[in-house]
Structure formats: C-alpha cells, structure tokens
Amino acid sequence: MAGAGLIGIRRRIKSVTNIRKITKAMGLVSTAKLRKARVNLEINKKYYNEYKVILKDIINFIEDSNIYIDGNGSHKKLYVIFTSDSGLCGSFNINIINNVINEIKEDKENSLVIVIGQKGRMYLKKLGINTLAEYIEIPDVPTTKEARTIAKNIIKLYSSKEVGEVFLVYSEFYSPVKQQVLINKILPFTKENKSDNKYIEFNPPVTQFIDEILENYLKATILNCFSNSKASENGSRMTAMNGATDNANDLLDNLDLQFNRLRQSAITQEISEIVGGAEAQR
C-alpha cells in the first residue's frame, strides 16, 4: 500500500514540477514584454495627449455643420473591443467582455461590434454576438499600420451612416496589478467653449483638412488603446503566472511532506516486520 502511495505522490511531484517550469518561464517572458510595452505606452501617450489638444482647438473653430461633430442621424452604436490573441492572462479578457455585454444588453438591435484579438472573437462567438469585423494576430508592439486599418473602417462606417456613435472598449493600464476597463466615446466629437482660442488662425480653412485630421486622431487614439491593452495584458499574465508558480511551490511543499511521511511510515513498518520475524524465530 505504501509503495503504491509513494509512486502516486512521486508522479504528482513530477507533474507539478513540470507545470511550475512552464509558469515560471511564462512569467519571465511576460515581465520582459511588459517592460517593453510600458516604454511603448509612455511614448504613444505623449503623442496622443498632444494630438488631443490640437484636435480640440480645431473642432472648436468649425462653425459649419459637420457630421463628425453634430452627428449623422444614425441610432446605431459601434463598439470596438480590444482583447488579446493569447490566453493565460487572468481575468483580462473576461472583464472586457462582461463590460461590453452589460453595455449592449438593453439595446442589442442597435449595437454593432468590431473585435480585436482571438480571445474576444472566441467569447463573442460563444455568446452568439455577431461582429462587423475581426482583427487578430496584432504584434506585441502595435504600429500605425494596424491603427490606420481600423481607423479607416470606423470612418467608413460612420460617414456612410451605418453607425451613429463609436465607442472604444479597452483596458487602461495603471500598474502590473491594476488595470481598468474603459468605454470611451470617440465619435461624434464634443465641442467646447472656444473663447480661449480666438487668437488662432487656420490657413487653409479647417474644413479643407478636417478629414485628414480626423483620421490621424483616430489612429493616435487607437494606437493609445493598443498600447494600454498590450501593457494590461502582459501585466495580467505576469501576475497570473507568478501566482500560479507560487501555488505550485506551495503544492510541492505539501507533496514533499506527504511523501516523506509516507516513506517514514513504510520504513517503520518494514523495521517492525523484521523485528517481529526475528522474535518469532527465537
């Protein structure tokens, strides 16, 4: 009995040890990717914030009717969802999907979805939610190429009045252990008081380059979402893998203790049997 128990525990120890090697390696890889993602995030955030200020000044000077400010009359809402291509990142993806479900459940008929990432596509398919477009295999460091493709699709859907409002759903990165799902409305734009901008003069007129400005702003916004999403994903994965490694260490400690106790019990039993046999032969 003891021998069979020892073999079973030894197998479990080997299995948990192999799993620990995997989780530890994935944790180290995620740490390295997170470091790179944070650098990229800081660079993109500065560009995005500067562009946002410029766009605000430009929009406040548009006096003519414009669908990007006044709306296009459509009641459809578009949600662009940023998820990951890979799993094993804790609750990163499910938190985003749950926020989307809560947002669209009361108005499903007027809610349209574009999903970014394999995991988001998989979850939405299971839930029976159709998508207008899907973007997968996004690189660890997203570029303007990916952002431009998505921005052009958004502009096309909005300018053709297929959608009347556009929201970006992504995870904002604060630290490796803190991320928050945000739902940001990006179209139509909101005008603010332009009293502070009366000294600004645009040449050529704003209306001649508003489309180009809009596309560049959307690219900057989407790139900012990508950067936050990648940092959040790797932060969540690093935390999840480090937690899994710690759990594996605790389990190995318990298994080692069980193994040693069982082996000690087996040795004691063998000694007792030997002594008992010797006594019987006297």
UniProtKB/Swiss-Prot annotation:
It comes from Clostridium botulinum (strain Okra / Type B1). It is found in: Cell membrane. One of its GO terms (molecular function) is proton-transporting ATP synthase activity, rotational mechanism. PANTHER family: ATP SYNTHASE GAMMA CHAIN (PTHR11693), ATP SYNTHASE SUBUNIT GAMMA, MITOCHONDRIAL (PTHR11693:SF22). The keyword Ion transport applies. InterPro entries: ATP_synth_F1_ATPase_gsu, ATP_synth_F1_gsu, ATP_synth_F1_gsu_CS. F-type ATPases have 2 components, CF(1) - the catalytic core - and CF(0) - the membrane proton channel. CF(1) has five subunits: alpha(3), beta(3), gamma(1), delta(1), epsilon(1). CF(0) has three main subunits: a, b and c. This is ATP synthase gamma chain. Produces ATP from ADP in the presence of a proton gradient across the membrane. The gamma chain is believed to be important in regulating ATPase activity and the flow of protons through the CF(0) complex. GO terms for cellular component: plasma membrane; proton-transporting ATP synthase complex. One of its GO terms (biological process) is proton motive force-driven plasma membrane ATP synthesis. It comes from the Bacteria. HAMAP family: ATP_synth_gamma_bact. Belongs to the ATPase gamma chain family. Keywords: ATP synthesis, Cell membrane, CF(1), Hydrogen ion transport, Ion transport, Membrane, Transport. It is a peripheral membrane protein.
